[in-house]
Amino acid sequence: MNSGLKWRKLGRVFCPTGETPWMQSHAAVPIAEHLHDDLFRIYFSSRDARNRSYTGSLIIDIADPTRVLDLSTTPVLAPGSLGEFDDSGAMATWLTEVGGRRHLYYIGWNLGVTVPFRNSIGLALASVDGSDRFVRYAPGPIVDRSMTEPHFCASCCVVPNGDVFSMWYLACTGWQLCNGRPEHKYHIRYAESVDGVVWSRSGEVAIDFANIEEYAISRPSVMRDADVWRMWYSHRGRSYRIGYAESADGRRWTRNDNKVGIEVSEHGWDSEMIEYPFVFDHKGRRYMLYNGNGYGRTGLGIAILEGLT
């Protein structure tokens, strides 16, 4: 186990400026997909004028990551039909390969009445033409509220792990009224699947609240190195920061937020908060995509791991 990480910010990659009706603002919850050579496709969640979430994509060269080479003109994934679990938004949260086909896990949004929203996890499969388009696996979610998780589930990370797939996912533990407004509380739990579709959940907590002020832990990003599992995630009491944890088996985690090695900037687009990390490797280097102020309203950025401190 190391004494600490050190990330160097490379800059902001992209921030929407109303390019299309479905991309009026936000570039939240980024995901990197390696295409070939140094080219990567970055998936992200944008919003339209009605505040509905869409999934879009762009392409960068990792050698010059703050220059966008291509930007999608149509959504990768759009909100579902009226009354479905994702009719208010379809926000990509993780991409992995299952049985030779790319599986895109996404957060489906429904607006609520007694509480502002309800989330669940949906699945879309890659189009057979190899493009960035995805088609829904089913009109309903694959992970939703249940008898033992009655509120909502959201952002997740899915990793092949021997004969199963491991999922770390956001689970809401409850809502309460604060000054007359409903406020949620959620942390990260663990689930397993043999096919990446049907998931077994036991309520096992992976990352729990550090103190009574903390109320939100989200967007896990897990890497398995030779000697340790590592997880990056968002956590907040007052405003979002990126956290870090280590594990010997991917199940029992030790939080080491003080070792994360990345903080808000003194000024600019990520000076108030940093959140929604996505960590990936390329040619022996480790990178992190992340969001800044406004939960993705100011765009997405990239950092590179420079080593241990």
Predicted regions mapped to residue ranges:
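Beta-rich carbohydrate-recognition and catalytic domains
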Residues: 1-25, 29, 33-88, 96-151, ...
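Metal-dependent C-N hydrolase catalytic cores
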Residues: 91
